[in-house]
């Protein structure tokens, strides 16, 4: 073997040799070890012993940490598979409140009454406000979800009358079930098929291999706004789907980008509907964005609104106070001829397939659903034309408001909601404005509450329990009061270098794998060699 430290070794040959730290990372990836572990200090209050634990970073993207992304993808696949073809109703029945919980709420009622009396008399209520806040914390700590007052802020609403250009949806009686219809075959067997649905957005212009044929006529503004509000459109589609299906439809969905850089939806739906009904639901689904107009630019370049501590943002030339977010919406509500800023709809391309449990089609659909979960939405383009297309879309997205709190509203003469000093149009830190998201600020994976009757943490715990049982290791019961966890700062003398921690984790993983192989061989009646780990 050529020695890289040999001075006589040609430079060209040295450059072909792998770097040592790259070999460590490659070995860690091959063995499923997180390459960006987070150091946490664990203090055992029972024994007084303190040690450092390497916690996985939990990244979901392969570009950041392939092992963690792979584990997350496997976890999502298990979640999808477990809930898609359930045959029994998920039992989600809240427990009856116990005596202690009732007692706390009674105290809360007394405190609220006394506080209201003081407020009516014009007396200060600070002491009771603090007591009520502490009672609310105690009520939640006792195992009660939510807040006793519910929503306290008023919610702005508009007319719910449907648009004239949208077809009406059929009304069907709702059934208290999350399971779809059961079909009987002539031989007496029962089938309860489910569906795999793919929906896309509308066209913005002709494309060839994902690139606009004529960028000048391609509607980048519509593409950007559709991406920004795509998550709201999905919510509306689910509402309409349940209304037409006649039962509480459960779903597992993922969002990914098409080659033209427009988001589209893949949805595993429990139960089945006719394709005609699904097409009707898609045609009738839309989302209106009732925001102030942002088609006219008022401030740009060096001419930007200035901040005043008392009034908020002002016009730098005239000193005029810009309308606040609520004032802009009030003006919009008062205009009887007002039109929504944007209306987002699905496109005409719809794919709906019937899927039976335990078939190759079901396995293939689950693989397809999770195929791109480890990839960034803004995956690197493979050609210069595609990179130019992505750059043009990013330029439009840069100044499109993504939320009511987006600094880009200043560009159009409106103060963002909860305005604060330092806001600059074009520098929003929102998720939708990041290059890797291409305008879509929602979640990549959408799972209904009654899909598998388990949270993602519970699915993770199931996998952990299986591994511990296979290793023959007893699961230590959770003891919330025994350990105190704290992050370890970079440069802490107790924190070993990252390469040392990776080497230790690799060794530990190899030991676990050898133990697993021995247990599997013993179960199959084989004898593993102590040196090679292969069957003798």
Locate each region found by the language model:
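Long, low-complexity, charged/polar intrinsically disordered accessory regions
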Residues: 1-105, 112, 126, 133, ...
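Generic recognition of stable, solvent-exposed alpha-helical segments in well-folded globular domains
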Residues: 60, 228-232, 236, 276-277, ...
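Histidine-centered divalent-metal-coordination microenvironment in nucleic-acid enzymes
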Residues: 65, 197, 248-277, 281-282, ...
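Signature for HUH/AEP ssDNA processing cores
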Residues: 69-71, 111-259
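Short helix/loop capping segments that flank catalytic or ligand/cofactor-binding pockets
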Residues: 73-76, 205-209, 276-278, 378
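N-terminal ectodomain recognition module in secreted, GPI-anchored, and membrane glycoproteins
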Residues: 221-224, 308, 345, 356
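Hydrophobic, Leu/Ile/Phe/Ala-enriched alpha-helical segments that form helix-helix packing faces
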Residues: 233-245, 281-294, 373
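Helical (often loop-to-helix) elements that flank the catalytic cores of nucleotide-handling enzymes
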Residues: 268-338
């Amino acid at each position: 073997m050529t020695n890289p430290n040999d001075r006589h070794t040609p430079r060209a040959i040295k450059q072909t040799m792998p770097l040592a730290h790259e070999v460590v990372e490659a070995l860690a990836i091959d063995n499923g070890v997180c390459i960006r572990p987070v150091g946490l200090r664990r203090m055992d209050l029972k024994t007084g012993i303190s040690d450092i634990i390497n916690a996985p970073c939990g990244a979901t993207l392969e570009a950041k940490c392939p092992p963690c992304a792979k584990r997350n993808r496997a976890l999502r696949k298990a979640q999808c598979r477990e809930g898609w073809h359930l045959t029994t109703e998920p039992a989600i029945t809240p427990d009856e409140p116990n005596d202690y919980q009732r007692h706390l709420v009674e105290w809360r009622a007394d405190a609220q009454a006394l506080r209201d009396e003081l407020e009516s008399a014009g007396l200060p209520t600070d002491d009771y406000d603090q007591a009520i806040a502490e009672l609310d914390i105690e009520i939640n700590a006792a195992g009660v979800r939510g807040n006793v007052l519910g929503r306290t802020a008023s919610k702005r609403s508009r007319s719910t009358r449907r648009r004239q250009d949208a077809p009406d949806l059929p009304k069907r009686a709702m059934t208290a079930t999350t399971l779809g219809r059961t079909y009987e075959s002539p031989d007496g067997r029962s089938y309860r098929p489910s569906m795999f649905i793919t929906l896309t957005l509308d066209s913005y212009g002709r494309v060839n291999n994902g690139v606009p044929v004529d960028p000048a006529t391609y509607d980048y503004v519509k593409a950007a706004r559709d991406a920004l509000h795509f998550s709201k459109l999905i919510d509306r589609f689910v509402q309409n789907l349940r209304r037409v299906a006649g039962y509480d439809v459960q779903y597992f969905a993922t969002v990914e980008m098409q080659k033209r850089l427009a988001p589209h939806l893949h949805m595993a739906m429990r139960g089945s509907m006719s394709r005609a009904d699904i097409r009707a639901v898609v045609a009738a689904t839309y989302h209106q964005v009732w925001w102030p107009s942002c088609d006219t630019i008022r401030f740009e370049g060096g001419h930007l609104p200035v901040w005043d501590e008392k009034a908020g943002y002002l016009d730098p030339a005239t000193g005029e106070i810009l309308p606040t977010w609520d004032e802009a919406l009030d003006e919009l509500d008062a205009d009887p001829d007002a039109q929504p800023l944007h209306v987002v709809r699905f496109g005409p391309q719809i794919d709906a397939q019937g899927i039976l449990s335990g078939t190759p089609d079901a396995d293939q659909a689950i693989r397809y659903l999770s195929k791109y979960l480890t990839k960034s939405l803004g995956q690197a383009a493979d050609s210069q034309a595609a990179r130019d297309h992505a750059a043009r879309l990013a330029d439009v997205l840069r100044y499109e408001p993504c939320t009511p709190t987006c600094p880009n509203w200043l560009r159009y003469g409106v103060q963002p909601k909860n305005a604060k000093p330092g806001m600059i149009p074009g520098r929003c830190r929102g998720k939708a404005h990041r290059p890797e998201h291409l305008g879509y600020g929602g979640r990549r994976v959408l799972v209904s509450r009654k899909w598998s009757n388990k949270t993602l943490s519970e699915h993770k715990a199931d996998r952990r329990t299986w591994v511990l049982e296979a290793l023959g290791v007893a699961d230590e019961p959770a003891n919330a009061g025994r350990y105190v966890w704290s992050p370890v700062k970079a440069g802490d003398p107790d924190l070993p270098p990252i390469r040392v921690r990776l080497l230790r984790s690799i060794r530990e993983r190899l030991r676990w794998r050898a133990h697993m192989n021995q247990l599997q061989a013993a179960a199959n009646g084989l004898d593993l060699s102590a040196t090679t780990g292969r069957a003798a």
